[in-house]
Amino acid sequence: MEYPNPPPPVTSNYQGEPEKIAQATDMMIKRVTDAKKIIEELLQMLDLQEKCPWPLMLEKFSTLASFMSSLQSSVRKSGMPHGHEDYGQFLRSHVLVTQRLQYEPDETLQRATQGRVMSWNHALVPEYLRTKPNPEMENEEGMLDGERSAKSADLVVRQIAAYNKNIEGLINHLNSVDRMHTEAAIEKPTYNRDETAKIVKSILTGEGIRSQRTMAPAPPSSAPMTTAPSSTGPSSSQPISGNQPEYQGSQLRQQLSGGQPQTSQAHLPMYSHHQQPQYSHQQPMNPQHHSPMKFQQ
């Protein structure tokens, strides 16, 4: 019975897009090679600076600056000529894995590195692929290990206990400060009790609510009225109060004698359509007809 082969392990972003990786690598190698060539020419000019013209050296410096700026732009675009700026996220998301290690000299590797690397062995892979810490970090770790081994066990225990005590005191102090801030924020009232009680009393009993009184408008000032000219009378206007006592006296005599009051055109003032008669006060009764007993029935 034959069993199927197990599927290969799935690794995230492991050469998922080999074409883009190859294109980005070629672009980066090209930019780095151009910058390296200019740097070599500048180093030769500095060795022969007495014989080298300064304008040519300044031109090389400007060319190197433009190449370095183009290299930085290519790194921001992950080596893609027409990509967007992701600041190398595409290159960091892909893993470089060593496919073969050998101690024999490799001509292709020598030609690519210009003779700096003879073979891809176990001693070079950790340094170039950064799979182990830097030598400076290793030296610091060795110094710490040496100091620890030089001290006695009792001294180390006492120092550890003192450090733990100081750290615990610092942590407790920080926790107490945080707790105090939290309690102060929780206990701080967000309302005023007096204002709340005042609002409740005003809603339930109407306490503290004042009604706004509206002031009555002032009465209009009275002005003297004049009579309009009649069709048969004079054209000049006459005041109303001129014929008022005689007219009221004749009406009063007619009412006391039992007859119907007669209105006379001579006694009635003529008013215009827009004017109304206004009397400032009631005229007194005629003193000759004060008592109704003098008239006969």
Swiss-Prot record:
GO cellular component, one term: mediator complex
InterPro entries registered for this protein in UniProt: Mediatior_Med8_fun/met (IPR019364)
Positions with biased composition (Polar residues): 285-297
Quaternary structure and partners: Component of the Mediator complex.
Family: Belongs to the Mediator complex subunit 8 family.
Function: Component of the Mediator complex, a coactivator involved in the regulated transcription of nearly all RNA polymerase II-dependent genes. Mediator functions as a bridge to convey information from gene-specific regulatory proteins to the basal RNA polymerase II transcription machinery. Mediator is recruited to promoters by direct interactions with regulatory proteins and serves as a scaffold for the assembly of a functional preinitiation complex with RNA polymerase II and the general transcription factors.
Protein name, entry field: Mediator of RNA polymerase II transcription subunit 8
Source organism (scientific name): Caenorhabditis elegans
Organismal lineage: Eukaryota, Metazoa, Ecdysozoa, Nematoda, Chromadorea
Primary gene name: mdt-8
